[in-house]
Amino acid sequence: MNKKVKKIFQSNEPYIFLIIILLGIVVQIRSGQFFTANNIVDLLSAMIVPGLFAIAEFMALIAGGIDVSFPALASLSAYATTKFLLDKNYEGNVLLAFVIAIAIGAVLGAFNGYFIGYLNLNAMIVTLGSASIFQGIMQGTLRANQLSVIPPGMKSFGTAAFLTATNKANGLTSILPYTFIILV
């Protein structure tokens, strides 16, 4: 084996990848339902939110820091936006929701950036503290609870099918929403 291949197999990642592939093959052999278009669409759909979070964290890592506040920041931005639009009985398209959520996220990100960039505080400590602050704002100030209704524009955007797959064996239909395009 050459040096590159030896170096690759000195880390854990190739073995984890092989285990995942083997598990997929075993499940496919046992059920016949793993490598179906329906399941692949479901897997892609399930990757949207974690994928967006991973991209956001990757940007922080590239910049030389670490951000542990991004789940709380995203939750606060999404909840505050949705609650605001519901309170205003907004029934327009999703573009306004994106603009508001991005603005809230930018302000909260600037809050972190001030302490990290200008005051030279440790990124891990700042974002850990700001995550607690953001969660406190959601639970204390906004009295966050589960929203059973969302504005129509947000709902239609989240449920509009970019791709549909139907499993002929069991009749299940899966949709890949347009939000997948944002991830890609």
Where are each of the predicted segments found?
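Membrane-embedded alpha-helical core segments of multi-pass
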Residues: 48, 52-56, 77-80, 104-111, ...
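Hydrophobic alpha-helical transmembrane segments
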Residues: 13-18, 43, 72-76, 95-103, ...
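Hydrophobic core segments of alpha-helical transmembrane domains in multi-pass membrane transport
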Residues: 16-28, 57, 102-105, 131-136, ...
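A cytosolic-side transmembrane-helix exit/cap motif
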Residues: 59-62, 91-97, 119-121, 141-152
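Transmembrane helix-bundle core of multi-pass membrane transporters
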Residues: 7, 124-184
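Single transmembrane alpha-helix segments in multi-pass membrane proteins
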Residues: 27-30, 35-88, 114-121
